[in-house]
Amino acid sequence: MTGALFNIDIRGREGRSLKEKWNGGPQTYLGLTTNGFPNMFTITGPGSPSVLTNMLPSIEQHVNFISDCISYMREHGHSRIEPELNAELDWGMHVNEVADVSLRSTCASWYVGANVPGKPRVFTPYIGGFPRYVERCESVVANGYEGFSLA
């Protein structure tokens, strides 16, 4: 789930690379954004249910979330969005807690990065189910993009 992103030299604040930030495993908020990389969205990224769902609805939900977010920002005079670090850390803990009840997180598979020598073993997809994920995203939006810093 990180390979395509690591093949691009993505740089955030102060020139820090995404690969450097995710050296110990990907950290995202809702699988859509990562702290330190303002205005950067990922579609079906780590921390989202993407690969464990029918990809078309996942992609559509992400595109709708992002486009609605951009519209909200324009309507409210914002030009920058970035997840708050605490929101990102809390989401990561939730993703791990949900994964820990499954055997998938213990298997040597690409889900944990076992297909890449030296890559940290981290279960990256959100396994809590697509409906539950959508509810969480909708709650974030309903609460004024809770967990995000807007400027």
Where do the language-model regions lie?
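C-terminal, flexible cofactor-proximal segment of oxidoreductases
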Residues: 28, 41-151
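Intrinsically disordered, low-complexity, compositionally biased regions/tails
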Residues: 7, 19, 148-151
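A generic structural signal for short, solvent-exposed coil/turn residues
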Residues: 2, 32-34, 102-104
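Short clusters of hydrophobic/aromatic residues that line enzyme substrate/ligand-binding pockets
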Residues: 8-10, 18, 81, 110
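E1/E1-like adenylate-forming module used to activate ubiquitin-like modifiers
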Residues: 11-46
